[in-house]
């Protein structure tokens, strides 16, 4: 008996009338989002799209980058898997896909239905058929004329930028003009003159965003840490000859607190005028709270009263003349001058030797005796006290020079700097020693005793007397008070506490205060050692100092001439390669045997620690830091690890005048732009091992929906990266689609050419030659409907396979370790490589790394990131460990594919493997065919397919909203009817979107329900009727099952049981 499925279409649900409750679906116009078209882009009143029942959508003005990379949490949300019913019917198993959704809905208990709110209006579904409902967004196409309209405007923007800065960057302008000419040439010679955006390919875009490949790469600039500066007129211009010093060393008056204006300047004036009074301490705390970003949890806030009490005692350790005069050197200089005045005439650079005698000598020694009686310290240069001091200082100076790599440097002795390569014990040294003793003695008379927990009086005396300036002394008193109160720490306090506010203020006035506290007061603080890490990596969005910053970058590429890939790895390998080989043959666990990939080679490429190319070599005679490195800047290196690959360490300079430019979209938001010549597409950048020193820059720009980006700095960078290798994006589609199209085609062409070289009759090309040929390959773009299509077509072309594969089913067989090897062996070429005893086909099996790690959504534990790669050495077939991350945020080919360029010696192409090498080969195949991979359960991106589609449509021709319902049937055989609900629609898009399921056995076709009626493309009968519904005339759509039987409320559960 035929059954019927009822759909009621009404303007608004007024009450739970019987006519409504008996219908399976109710479609209303309540809450419908108004259409809005802006400059040819069809959209909505986006304010009305926030937080509607249905998809879990956040505010429309959130950036697309934040939307994709941040986890979105919605109350009452749960995941759904739109295609599971069809997959169960088709494959009798669950197929993990990319279009999962997070749904938020609400039960309407009166209607006994479930409410969702798509853009077309509120909809109510009966519970038994609701689980098979999902939402879809169509990214509409834009006219090509509008897509191409930005080309001339970009050139105009950079011309105006040059005028604004009054600096013409000839290289940049030349690049932009080259790009314009290349794009126009492609449009004229290859692309259609009229039409609409060719394709969007949301699935591939989605995957490339997940894999961090939707964009380009540019080098980190490793610039001198902001704590350091280059000493002028010292050393040479080359980075290796620089002399640098800490910015906080020397005159503190370069600080903002001496600028003459501003709150920090006003606070300094008050401290110097009023000392550390209660009111001054309160103002110091209030200032620090405005800027404090501490997020610690340390309990027990120090009170104002306790701080006043501490300071009352600690300030007595500050020499009186520092308080009175307030000048840096007053106390020491005044005392020293007075002492020198009473001395006999002497050569102060000679050793301190003097005997008692008549006249002036007699008076001098009388003064020394008087000093001893008055202060209890014998400073007679002929007595043991001075000689003991000479011995102690000499040992200290010798130790300091040894620690400085044998180079002379300066050490603070008795409050002054002394060179380590001079003989200690001169008259000057003796006077400085006596001066320091006098300062300690004079201060000690005024010191108040206090029961400190951690501080020691003798250290406080020595420390305060060695400091420069009363301001520094007072601020350090506060820091020391906190150190003592919290018994040995000055960090980890709660935000807004008195302690955290004081430390913030001290840090702003004296950024290097922690080091000085440790060195001068003998306290124990945990400090990050940065003296050997002088350089830090920065990107184009980093902040740079006004006066400019200096450092270096890594550049790399491939040279064409004079290189041969048919060579073995030789002397560049260490003994660890043999150790690993033996460990594998003995059956030891891979994770226990494998080491850092760098350990298998003698050379150091700095891929793990690129910020440490230049290290501290110690200090010069002026206490400036000198640099050392085994590499030279501006020298091109050709590593024996690779063939045509080169890299160079180049000096860089980032200045506001040259590098600061405005953003195209936010014209008042400046950023610092690096040299275009270094930019690389991700596909090409990953061919080099130094991709670890580069930054991935994505193209996720603008709001997550409702904003059209015509051009942006990120898109310029992408275009410049392509232009560097002779390629341009296509302009027969929108910029989002064209950016992914060129990237996926480059990857496909590169991988096919690289691994096809291992076929017996193929050309043995270097990467440089391959890159040239690939640029020709990608002039005509291949179309890949999904990432899996790209993945399988690449695999088939490498193994010369022309079968028509069922994409989803075959992909899942490759993913499953139970069926992976069996599926791979269906490729004749793969099976031939497995069975062959020759070296060259064996090396082609390195393609297994691509097969395994380039699957979509795969997750690899970073703790097990080192995996095997086969290489040909002078000793035969061997294996090394490679890093599949290579310091990147995601899985990257750059950690292993550079090693594939070198193949084997020409004489070994037909060489048969030994028994041990065959054992290694079998182990290698088993390793990758049984390597278990986790599907990435990435909470931040796994449920954002429709949000991404909406962003794409917003940047092209607009967005259409659909609700799709699958109605399963059970007789005469299992099948499904697709019912699609929309306000307006394009039936061709729906048919294309659902084609894979509409063409399967058991499909009953689709019925499109929209405002104007229905479009029936199914085998069932559908009628449009009128129904009088409590005072209003509504539309009722009845779908008759005919000879088919719609599933009952338990059918979905029965279908799911088949997947277990």
Curated annotation (Swiss-Prot):
Keywords of the record: Capsid protein, Inner capsid protein, Virion
Subcellular localization, as worded in the UniProt entry: Virion
Keyword Chaperone tagged: no
Write one Gene Ontology MF term: structural molecule activity
Q: Name one GO cellular component term.
A: viral inner capsid
- Give the protein family: Belongs to the orbivirus VP2 family.
Summarizing the function annotation, the protein's role is:
The VP2 protein is one of the two proteins (with VP5) which constitute the virus particle outer capsid. It is the major target of the host immunogenic response.
Q: What is this protein called?
A: Outer capsid protein VP2
Q: From which source organism is this entry? A: African horse sickness virus 4
């Amino acid at each position: 008996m035929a059954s019927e499925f009822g759909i009621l279409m009404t303007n608004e649900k007024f009450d739970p009338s019987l006519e409504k409750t008996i219908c399976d679906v109710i479609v209303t116009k309540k809450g419908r989002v108004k259409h809005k078209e802006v400059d040819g882009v069809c959209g909505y009143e986006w304010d009305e799209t926030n937080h509607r029942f249905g998809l879990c959508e956040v505010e429309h003005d959130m950036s697309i980058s934040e939307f994709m990379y941040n986890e979105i949490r919605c109350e009452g949300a749960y995941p759904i898997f739109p295609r599971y019913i069809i997959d169960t019917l088709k494959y009798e198993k669950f197929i993990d896909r990319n279009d999962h959704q997070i749904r938020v809905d609400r039960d309407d208990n009166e209607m006994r239905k479930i409410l969702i709110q798509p853009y077309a209006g509120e909809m109510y579904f009966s519970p038994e058929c609701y689980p098979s409902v999902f939402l879809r967004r169509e990214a509409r196409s834009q006219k090509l004329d509008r897509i191409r309209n930005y080309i001339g405007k970009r050139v105009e923007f950079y011309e105006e930028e040059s005028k604004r800065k009054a600096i013409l960057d000839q290289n940049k302008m030349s690049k932009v003009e080259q790009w314009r000419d290349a794009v126009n040439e492609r449009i004229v010679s290859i692309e259609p003159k009229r039409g609409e955006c060719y394709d969007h390919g949301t699935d591939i875009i989605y995957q490339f965003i997940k894999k961090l490949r939707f964009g380009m790469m540019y080098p980190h600039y490793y610039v001198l840490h902001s704590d350091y500066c280059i000493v002028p007129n010292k050393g040479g211009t080359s980075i290796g000859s620089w002399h640098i010093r800490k910015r906080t060393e020397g005159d503190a008056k370069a600080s903002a607190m001496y600028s003459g204006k501003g709150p920090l300047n006003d606070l300094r004036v008050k401290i110097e005028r009023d000392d550390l009074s209660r009111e001054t301490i309160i103002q110091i705390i209030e200032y620090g709270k405005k800027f404090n970003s501490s997020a610690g949890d340390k309990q027990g806030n120090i009170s104002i009263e306790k701080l006043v009490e501490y300071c009352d005692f600690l300030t007595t350790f500050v020499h009186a003349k520092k308080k009175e005069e307030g000048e840096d050197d007053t106390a020491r200089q005044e005392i020293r001058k007075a002492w020198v005045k009473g001395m006999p005439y002497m050569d102060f650079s000679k050793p301190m030797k003097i005997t008692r005698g008549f006249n002036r000598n007699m008076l001098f020694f009388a003064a020394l005796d008087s000093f001893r009686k008055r202060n209890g310290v014998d400073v007679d240069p002929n007595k043991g006290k001075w000689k003991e001091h000479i011995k102690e200082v000499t040992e200290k100076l010798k130790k300091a020079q040894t620690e400085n790599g044998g180079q002379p440097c300066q050490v603070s002795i008795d409050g002054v700097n002394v060179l380590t390569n001079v003989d200690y014990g001169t008259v000057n040294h003796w006077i400085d020693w006596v001066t320091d003793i006098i300062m300690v003695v004079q201060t000690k008379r005024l010191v108040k005793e206090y029961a400190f927990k951690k501080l020691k009086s003798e250290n406080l005396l020595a420390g305060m007397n060695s400091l420069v300036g009363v301001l520094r002394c007072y601020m350090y008193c506060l820091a020391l008070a906190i150190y003592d109160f919290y018994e040995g720490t000055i960090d980890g306090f709660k935000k807004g506490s008195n302690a955290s506010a004081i430390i913030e203020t001290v840090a702003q006035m004296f950024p290097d205060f922690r080091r000085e506290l440790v060195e001068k007061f003998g306290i124990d603080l945990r400090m990050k050692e940065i003296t050997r890490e002088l350089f830090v990596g920065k990107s184009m969005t980093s902040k740079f100092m006004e006066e400019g910053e200096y450092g270096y970058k890594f550049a790399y590429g491939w040279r064409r001439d004079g290189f041969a890939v048919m060579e073995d790895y030789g002397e560049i390998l260490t003994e660890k390669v043999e150790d690993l080989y033996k460990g594998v043959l003995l059956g030891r666990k891979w994770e226990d045997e494998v080491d850092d990939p760098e350990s298998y080679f003698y050379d150091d490429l700095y891929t793990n620690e690129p910020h440490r190319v230049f290290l501290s070599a110690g200090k010069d005679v002026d206490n400036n830091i000198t640099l050392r490195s085994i590499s030279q800047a501006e020298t091109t290196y050709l590593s024996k690890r690779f063939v045509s690959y080169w890299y160079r360490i180049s000096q860089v300079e980032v200045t506001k005048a040259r590098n600061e430019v405005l953003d195209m979209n936010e014209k008042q938001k400046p950023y610092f732009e690096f040299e275009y010549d270094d930019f690389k597409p991700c596909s090409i950048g990953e061919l080099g091992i130094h991709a670890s020193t580069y930054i991935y820059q994505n193209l996720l720009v603008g709001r997550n929906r409702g904003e059209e980006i015509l051009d942006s700095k990120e898109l310029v960078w992408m275009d410049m990266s392509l232009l560097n290798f002779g390629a341009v994006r296509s302009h027969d589609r929108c910029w989002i689609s064209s950016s992914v199209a060129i990237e996926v085609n480059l990857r496909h062409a590169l991988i096919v050419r690289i691994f096809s070289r291992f076929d017996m009759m193929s050309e043995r090309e270097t990467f440089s030659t391959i890159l040239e040929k690939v640029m020709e390959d990608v002039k005509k773009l291949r179309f890949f409907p999904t990432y899996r299509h790209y993945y399988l077509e690449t695999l088939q072309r490498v193994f010369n396979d022309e079968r028509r594969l069922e994409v989803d089913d075959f992909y899942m067989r490759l993913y499953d370790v139970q069926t992976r090897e069996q599926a791979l062996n269906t490729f004749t070429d793969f099976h031939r490589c497995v069975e062959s005893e020759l070296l060259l086909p064996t090396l082609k099996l390195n393609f297994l790394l691509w097969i395994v790690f380039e699957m979509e959504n795969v997750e690899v534990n970073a703790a097990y990131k080192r995996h095997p790669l086969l290489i040909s050495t002078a000793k035969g077939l061997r294996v090394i460990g490679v890093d599949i991350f290579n310091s990147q945020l995601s899985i990257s080919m750059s950690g292993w594919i550079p090693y594939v360029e070198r193949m084997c010696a020409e004489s070994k192409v037909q060489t048969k493997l030994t028994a041990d090498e065959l054992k290694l080969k079998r182990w290698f195949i088993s390793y990758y065919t049984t390597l278990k991979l986790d599907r990435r359960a990435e909470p931040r991106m796994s449920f954002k397919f429709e949000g991404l589609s909406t962003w794409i449509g917003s940047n092209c021709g607009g967005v259409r909203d659909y609700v799709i319902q699958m109605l399963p049937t059970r007789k005469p055989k299992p099948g499904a009817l697709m019912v699609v609900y929309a306000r307006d629609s394009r039936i061709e898009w729906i048919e294309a979107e659902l084609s894979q399921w509409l063409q399967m056995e058991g499909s009953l076709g689709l019925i499109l329900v929209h405002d104007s009626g229905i479009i029936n493309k199914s085998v069932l009968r559908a009628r449009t009727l009128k129904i009088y519904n409590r005072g209003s005339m509504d539309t009722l759509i009845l779908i008759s099952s005919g000879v088919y039987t719609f599933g009952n409320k338990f059918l979905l559960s029965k279908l799911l049981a088949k997947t277990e």
